Amino acid sequence: MPTINQLIRKKRQSSASRKKSPALQKCPQRRGVCLQVKTKTPKKPNSALRKVAWVRLSNGQEVIAYIGGEGHNLQEHSIVLVQGGRVKDLPGVRYHIVRGALDCAAVKNRKQSRSRYGAKRPK
């Protein structure tokens, strides 16, 4: 417990809240280049091979981003758009790649939740 004199000399510091997506630096999305595209296995009760990409953003930071949807066309040197949003069962994956933007193709034959996957309205 500090004394009153100590509090006068140095005020109490309010703890800054932790940012959920610090690499975006308050931007809604950022452009980046894929360094490698791999699969990761999820945390304990789940089992799958989730597709992720290591991306170097336009601000120079490197992040791991999740590639949503069934099938993708990404490879090394692909230009992608990255937005915030973690994947609950993949530790360290705090970003999503936007489907249907830049080099990342939209999901084919998608009928529902199309806007999330960049799919056009079927005729």
UniProtKB/Swiss-Prot annotation:
PANTHER family: 30S RIBOSOMAL PROTEIN S12 FAMILY MEMBER. GO terms for biological process: translation. Pfam families: Ribosom_S12_S23 (PF00164). GO terms for cellular component: small ribosomal subunit. InterPro entries: NA-bd_OB-fold, Ribosomal_uS12, Ribosomal_uS12_bac. Residues 8-21 have a biased composition (Basic residues). It comes from Chlamydia felis (strain Fe/C-56). The lineage of its organism: Bacteria, Pseudomonadati, Chlamydiota, Chlamydiia, Chlamydiales. Belongs to the universal ribosomal protein uS12 family. Keywords: Methylation, Ribonucleoprotein, Ribosomal protein, RNA-binding, rRNA-binding, tRNA-binding. Residues 1-29 are annotated as: Disordered. The keyword Thylakoid does not apply. Part of the 30S ribosomal subunit. Contacts proteins S8 and S17. May interact with IF1 in the 30S initiation complex. Gene3D superfamilies: Nucleic acid-binding proteins. This is Small ribosomal subunit protein uS12. With S4 and S5 plays an important role in translational accuracy. The modification 3-methylthioaspartic acid is found at residue 89. GO terms for molecular function: rRNA binding; structural constituent of ribosome; tRNA binding. CDD domains: Ribosomal_S12. PROSITE patterns: RIBOSOMAL_S12.
